Amino acid sequence: MSPKTETPSSPHPPAVLVIRDGWGRNPHPAEAAFDAIRKANTPVADDLEANWPTTLVRTSGEDVGLPIGADGPVMGNSEVGHQNIGAGRIVDQELMRITRSIRSGEFFENAALLDAFAHAAETGGRVHLLGLVSDGLVHSDLGHLVALLDAAKRRGFPGDRVLIHAITDGRDTPPTGGVGYLAELQRGIESHGTGRVVSVMGRFYAMDRDHRWERVEAAYRCLTERSGPRHDTAAAAAEAYYAEPSEASRHGDEFVTPSQIGADDADVLESRIRDGDSVVFFNFRGDRPREITKAFTLDDDAWAAVERGGFDRGARLRDLRFTAMTRYESGLPVEVMFEKPPRMEGILGAVVSDAGLTQFRCAETEKFPHVTFFFNDYREEPFPGERRAIVPSPTDVSTYDQKPEMSADGVMEAVLERLAADDCERLIVVNFANGDMVGHTGSMEAAVAACEKVDACVGRII
């Protein structure tokens, strides 16, 4: 029977893969008071575990292609999880590839990196190192930034022309751990005798991925203009925000106001990104650097056509050499230090497509790249027979603890519509973002509500 004529009541009903993002099992009963999943009323999940075949899989360290750190296996994340699920095998992650190249010395001969230094030397410009200063190992590695300082020293590049724009974390790290990471960075600066921190900003602004362009604009203007409060040191910028957050729900490193670091206004102006400079964005994960990278690199026509309109960036910077640690998105006009390895053969989406079967991928905006781009091994375009649906994530709140249901109902309805269709696909992959995105806010009450919403939606689909 043709896949297009098969329905859920046919001999070959669809297989539905439901990904409850951020949903896990904590084996330590002593921590139950901090476990939103344990505290939530989840009758559907309880029934599935009690009455249907159930297993647990490990999602960290070498089981998903990540290293073993000083404190044990490095935790997985949404990108890593979706790529491993889609591949059906352990996938060596970008973090490992880059770290190995540093250990072998190949990193310091990387052609794209050397070109960034050469360009700034030729124009008399500066090299700006931009990225997440954190040991979360989800988007970046502080050790990679220190290696870039080492590379600058090895090339003999003037230390006062190596400028660091530090993005603070607070999502994959403790909420106020940023001061400690900035201190660790300062030790790296001093040991190599090169570089200085010239701006600090929370990832809420510099690493948006939901087209909240007003956030990206605040980061961009801090990087290119005399915009934002000025502080004498990076630590002072973070501590000032801890003392006076912009909103009651915006605590910690994630939300640090884009801030200038310098002795005075003249010093600040001298350290902004300008014509003829080089920028090295050292984040290795691709989804969150895309928006601000586009603001720096797209020509005027492409910038005018970005989704949801972008912002008025003024005149595009001229003769800017922008280098990304990895390929954030195909078609971006940037130099790339570490290109993706050859695509894997036999991943799930390809196997389904090659068999002449159809598939449906669905998520809200926050997780749509995960069920498409990451699930398909960094493939932007759909496979033949792959249908996609994106449900907009809420934009009327600044943090999802204010709306823990997010857009789960819309995602559920999109799946139910396909299940009821005469041409229902043979494979449905759906992501519910709530557990992860609301959990990151640190609000127990909201996280419990998020889990209960997801459980109800899964029950409707089943």
What are these regions (language model features)?
Residues 125-139, 425-441:
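Short acidic, glycine-rich surface-loop motifs adjacent to enzyme active sites
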Residues 12-14, 415-436:
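Active-site regions of oxyanion-processing enzymes, predominantly non-cytosolic
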Residues 146-160, 410-420, 435-462:
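A long, amphipathic alpha-helix that forms part
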